Amino acid sequence: MIEWHEFSEERRGIDPDERGFQYGDGLFETIAIRQGEPRLWDYHFRRLEAGCKRLALKRPAVAALRDRLGTAIAESAHDSDSCIAKIIVTAGVSERGYGRATPTDPTIYVGVFPATPVNQPAYEKGVATILCETRLAVGSPVAGLKTLNRIEQVLARSECLPTGAFEGLTLDADGRLICGTMS
């Protein structure tokens, strides 16, 4: 189970008018935590910052976000030697409709959950993979961003489960290999 920490001055819980909930208007980063420290923190923060810029979201301050992450890890009941953190930055609450007519204050959520280790034989012998039928969009303005709207990835990953495959490989509409469903 994920333990969520919301860092908003005004509310607790998810507001139904939250743009992240309504439209997938936001970003996320999933970060491995080892010995209580986020791995590749600078990389993850730079990618989150670049995504905020591309989506015209107010960027969180690095020190404040790092402090919030540290608080969530410290307060978590999960083993901080090996767990996972997920940071979600949404566009916050605004008027109804796709457009953000007025600037919004982002909402930041930090979740901490147990890491699922890959068993040793998988490292030694490899894992079963499939080529997913679901194709990823070509030329999307959000390509490369970890947006909250991940329906293509959800559909592709759902193809793996009935087959028992550990990983699914996804292609774009032009047949080029893009990524794995988990990697």
Language model regions located:
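Conserved alpha/beta cores of soluble small-molecule-handling proteins
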Residues: 1-169, 173-176
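Glycine-rich phosphate/ribose-binding loops and adjacent secondary-structure elements
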Residues: 179-183
